[in-house]
């Protein structure tokens, strides 16, 4: 008997609504004096009309792309490779219950990490704890641009590529192996959306604390960066353990998350050097070699 699944709320719609809800909290707060210890440095580009237009356009594009590419029940890419097969054999959980809990845990981590820069860094720390609504708003706009860009690229890539999730290999006629069996979600493997959004938020948190002393000027910032980085890494591994993504999907998602979470705010707002008010000296140094290109992040915290 074929099970009828309830329609899923598109994650792009949820992200756009969450951003709108968080933004309303900034406007709902009464005006108050700025805290003395948290200021937006003159050399950092401030959010302006172009950023607001860009963020609105990105939000609309996320909704549009989500509707245009809902996924296909017949994946267009079913190819495999030794790297993906080896990682799957090593990490995939054999028990359906264990895979289910791995998936639920990764969902919780993904949601928490996706909201973290906007809810914790921008609202709770900058606006409430440090009493600096100006810095909080600047951080929130950067968060919106970064998260919505990552979401848009993720959903568009999933819809255009149409790669089969690894779990499709195990789906029998009844689809008991996984709830995604037979659904449109089974063709949204590349790239890993949980990973791209989680790594995006972790990278953005690390960049924010490197420039703005949200966690103080001691070990708080590096510890927060390490914590969200480990959490994002955990989400990445759990997606393979739950048989939701191939390892190459996870690697691509992590690369996108790093680009949108770190390079995006550096290029558009902070610049690639520590300002006068920076909580640390932060540098991104390109390293080129034969067949490789790396960006080395270095700094003193």
Question: Where is each model-derived feature located?
Answer:
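Extracytosolic (periplasmic/ER-lumenal) interhelical loops and adjacent juxtamembrane/interface segments
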Residues: 84-96, 177-182
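Transmembrane helix recognition focused on a "late"/terminal membrane span
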Residues: 115-118, 269
């Amino acid at each position: 008997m074929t099970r009828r699944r309830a329609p899923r709320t598109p994650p792009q719609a949820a992200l756009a609504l969450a951003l709108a809800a968080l933004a309303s909290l900034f406007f709902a707060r009464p005006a108050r004096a700025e805290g003395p210890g948290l200021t937006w440095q003159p050399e950092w580009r401030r959010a302006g009309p172009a950023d607001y237009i860009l963020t609105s356009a990105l939000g609309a594009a996320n909704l549009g792309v989500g509707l245009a590419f809902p996924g296909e029940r017949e994946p267009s890419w079913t190819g495999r490779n030794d790297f993906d097969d080896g990682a799957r054999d090593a990490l995939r959980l054999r028990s359906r219950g264990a895979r289910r809990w791995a998936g639920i845990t990764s969902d919780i981590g993904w949601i928490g990490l996706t909201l973290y820069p906007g809810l914790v860094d921008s609202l709770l720390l900058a606006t409430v704890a440090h009493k600096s609504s100006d810095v909080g708003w600047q951080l929130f706009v950067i968060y919106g641009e970064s998260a919505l860009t990552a979401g848009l690229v993720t959903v568009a890539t999933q819809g255009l590529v149409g790669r089969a999730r690894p779990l499709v290999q195990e789906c029998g006629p009844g689809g008991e192996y996984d709830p995604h069996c037979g659904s449109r979600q089974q063709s949204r493997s590349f790239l890993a959306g949980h990973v791209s959004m989680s790594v995006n938020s972790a990278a953005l948190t690390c960049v924010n604390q490197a420039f703005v002393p949200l966690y103080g000027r001691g070990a708080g910032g590096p510890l927060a960066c390490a914590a969200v980085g480990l959490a994002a890494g955990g989400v990445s591994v759990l997606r393979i353990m739950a048989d939701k993504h191939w390892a190459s999907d996870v690697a691509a998602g992590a690369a996108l998350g790093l680009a949108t979470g770190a390079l995006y705010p550096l290029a558009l707002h902070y610049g690639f050097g520590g300002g006068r008010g920076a909580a640390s000296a932060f540098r991104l140094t390109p390293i080129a070699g034969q067949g490789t290109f790396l960006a080395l992040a270095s700094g003193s915290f």
